[in-house]
Amino acid sequence: DLFVFGGGSSGQRVERGSDLVQTLNITLEEVATGTSKEISVTHRKLCPTCNGSKAEPNSAVNTCSQCNGSGQVRQVQNTPLGQFATVSECPTCHGEGKVIENKCHDCLGSGLKKITEKITINIPAGVETGTKLRVTGEGDDSVNGGVSGDLYVTINVLKHDLFTRNGQDLYYELPISYVQACLGDQVEVPTIDGKNAKLTIPAGTQTETSFKLRNEGLKHVKWSGVGNLYVKVHVVVPKQLSEKQKD
């Protein structure tokens, strides 16, 4: 009996190009509206000199004499239990099935070359920190006819000076005076679109009371609907009262 170990497909190995990951910072205002960003991406693309062949132009590419172009070598050992055959990568051509006389001077025989390009990323409204956007084919190229890898852009939403976020809802801290809390008032609250919304504070409002402004939050990235803006008031009590306030 003959027992065979190792092996795999013969000839050139066709492998998919590597994926790339890059982080992109955006503001909360950009989350609210959606935006497009141009980023610089360094990836390995087919060498423009050899077009991925790895060989110097007009240089001979010969079939490997050790493996006859299969990219694999086979060794057979006789044992008391029978013959054992092992199949492994050809050490001469490293599994390529061919031997290049003169490697490309531009890519040093790798078939790929690093280039930096500008790519436009379309960011939908409502994304969160950690959201991954895939750009097909913008990873590393593959040699031997494989599919190019993809570029994954990981979103990082920067901290905002006024608002905090929970999902699609926004939160805002509003200081009001003791008089406003006692007598009530109508105030303006900033919103993420750069405008202001009116908020009515009823008389007798206690500190840390929250009010909801509907549809003043963020859009959802997958379906229609807008979050709310929650305004928490903090009553500022003066440490000293004027004579007029005492009266």
Regions found by a protein language model. Give the residues of each.
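Charged, often glycine-enriched C-terminal and inter-domain segments
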Residues: 13-36, 98-247
